[in-house]
Structures are given as C-alpha cells and as structure tokens.
Design a protein with these regions (language model features):
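Double-stranded RNA-binding/processing signature
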Residues: 1-172
C-alpha cells in the first residue's frame, strides 16, 4: 500500500495529515499479519490499542465532564462507558472506513468482529503519540461527537439489561 494513498485515507478519517505515518501503519496492522521487526519482535497494533484505550477513556471522560456540568459521577461514568463500548467503536470503525484500512490475513477479519473497534483504539493511540492529547481531543470532538454521535442521545438512552442478558444467553 502506498504511503500517499494512506496519507489521503487518514486525512479523510482524522481531519489532519499525520506527522509520523509509522504510528498509523502500526495501528492498522492486525496481529494476524505476523509481521516482525529487524530484532524479530512482533509488530502489530496491540500495544497502540492498549494506549488508545486509556487515552480514549481520558478524552471521552474529559468531554463528558465538560458537557454535563451538573451531573453526578455515576451518570458521567455510565455515559463515558456507553460512548467507548466495543459496539460503538466497531460501528464507528465501519462507518469511517477504518475497517478497510486494517491489514490482516483475511481469515481473521471475517471472524473477529472486534477488529475495527480495536483498530479505532489503536488509531487514537497513534494520534496521541504523533500529535498529543489535544489532537485526540480535537479528533473526538470534531470528527466523532460533532458528526457521528449525539452525546445527549447516548447519555440518556436506556440500556435494556434484560434484553442484553437474553441476547447474551442465546449466543453462549
């Protein structure tokens, strides 16, 4: 894949061009590729996913805290968890075209429904390393919450735990 094409695709998704594209390449590399660096260590998006998960929690927590000034901790925690839950991240990755950029060995992508959400988190980790916390904040506010997710709608949406439990029990 050419860097120029990737730069353009990332610009479409992120709203800015990367400074160091290597972070973003790694963020889009699923472990099924089995790529190794010169020292023989695996190169994939798992570490960036770990970092992105933590940064995403902080950024979304910050946004929720600012957006709902009079709300209690329980409401804020619940709202943040709804915004960063796996289903939400998978849906965002699909809608934004992140899934199409992930390098994997075809077999795993069809069986791993979390791959897109994991790549989304890894991209947040890449943004953080490449451009810092403020860039992650801008990305979430301008690209995600302003265009793709209504924070008030998510915050006040009731989660039907009974139907979730039934759904889970039927799958397992």
């Amino acid at each position: 894949r050419k860097d120029k094409e990737l730069y353009f695709s990332l610009y479409e998704i992120l709203g800015f061009y990367p400074h160091d594209i290597s972070y973003y390449k790694m963020a889009l590399m699923h472990k099924s590729i089995m790529h190794r660096n010169a020292k023989g260590k695996p190169v994939n998006n798992e570490r960036l996913e770990f970092l992105g998960d933590a940064v995403l929690d902080a950024v979304v927590g910050d946004i929720v805290y600012q957006h709902f000034p009079g709300k209690r901790e329980g409401f804020l925690t619940n709202t943040r968890s709804k915004l960063v839950q796996r289903d939400t991240l998978n849906k965002l990755a699909q809608e934004m075209g992140i899934n199409q950029l992930v390098l994997s060995n075809g077999h795993s992508s069809s069986h791993n429904s979390y791959m897109g959400g994991n790549a989304f988190e890894a991209l947040v980790g890449a943004i953080y390393l490449d451009r810092g916390y403020d860039a992650c904040m801008q990305f979430m506010q301008k690209r995600i919450l302003a265009k793709m997710i209504n924070i008030d709608k998510v915050a006040y949406k009731e989660v039907n735990f009974k139907s979730k439990l039934i759904e889970w029990s039927q799958k397992n």
